[in-house]
Amino acid sequence: MEVVERKTEMAEEGCTTPRSTMYRIPVASVCPPPPRKKLMVVRKRDPPRNGYFQPPDLETLFYAQPRREACA
């Protein structure tokens, strides 16, 4: 008879939320800091020992056109 009473009590109470610590949401922990950028190692390069290469026909490739005047 006790089994029938328990089922009846459960049916009357309805659904309930579990309250055990096993079912609780854990407390939020502190997030780790964001990753840092790597430091850029800037090293000034020395000019080449033999100097820079200057081809004799460089001006023919990069011809500078004269600027046009605006019409007024």
UniProtKB/Swiss-Prot annotation:
The keyword Cell cycle applies. Expressed in root meristems after induction. Induction: Up-regulated by double-stranded DNA breaks-inducing treatments. Up-regulated by DNA damage. One of its GO terms (molecular function) is protein kinase inhibitor activity. GO terms for biological process: regulation of DNA endoreduplication. Keywords: Cell cycle, Protein kinase inhibitor. Interacts with CDKA-1 and D-type cyclins. Probable cyclin-dependent protein kinase (CDK) inhibitor that functions as a repressor of mitosis in the endoreduplication cell cycle. Acts as a potent cell cycle inhibitor. This is Cyclin-dependent protein kinase inhibitor SMR4. It comes from Arabidopsis thaliana (Mouse-ear cress). The gene is SMR4.
